[in-house]
């Protein structure tokens, strides 16, 4: 799985950029340190819709081994990253928006089997994208 993050607003060090632990995709699936109860109506994590399945100790160790990066850029920028790259964001405490659209193109036979977030955070629609005709915008 590859992910694309499209910045709809400028992303700066002040408005909570997504942080990445570079190279962690090479580790494959990192086993979670915690088990969360699910909220039935959302199928999400009970403690926090965007909570981490990893302890602070695990995250600290991985950052010490691999470093930490927080891509920033103007609206319209796109960041591509492997789905197994450890990533997350702090809350945006600034007065400036930080709207980012995440897109995860993937084969339909490789879909997520246990969604962890409500649709308003991560839409779980696994229908195949249907191609349009070449003249779809002019006809």
Annotate each language-model stretch with its function.
Residues 9, 69, 91:
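Short, flexible, glycine/charge-rich loop motifs used to bind or transfer phosphoryl groups or to couple energy/partner
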Residues 1-13, 48, 72-75, 80, ...:
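Short, conserved beta-strand element in jelly-roll/cupin
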Residues 34-38, 75-80, 84-139:
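Non-heme Fe(II)/2-oxoglutarate
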Residues 1-5, 45-55, 120-129:
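Short, surface-exposed, charge-dense and proline/glycine-enriched linear segments
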Residues 14-86:
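Double-stranded beta-helix
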Residues 13-14, 96:
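A cross-taxa feature marking solvent-exposed loop/turn segments within ectodomains of secreted
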């Amino acid at each position: 799985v590859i992910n694309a993050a499209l910045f709809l607003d400028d992303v700066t060090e002040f408005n909570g950029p997504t942080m990445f632990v570079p190279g962690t995709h090479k580790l494959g699936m990192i086993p979670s340190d915690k088990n969360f109860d699910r909220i039935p109506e959302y199928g999400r994590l009970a403690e926090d819709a965007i909570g981490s399945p990893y302890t602070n100790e695990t995250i600290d160790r991985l950052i010490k081994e691999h470093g930490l990066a927080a891509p920033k850029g103007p609206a319209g920028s796109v960041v591509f990253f492997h789905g197994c790259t450890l990533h997350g964001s702090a809350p945006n405490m600034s007065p400036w928006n930080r709207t980012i659209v995440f897109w995860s193109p993937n084969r339909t036979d490789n879909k997520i089997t246990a969604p962890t977030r409500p649709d308003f955070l991560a839409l779980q629609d696994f229908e195949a994208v249907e191609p349009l005709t070449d003249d779809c915008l002019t006809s």
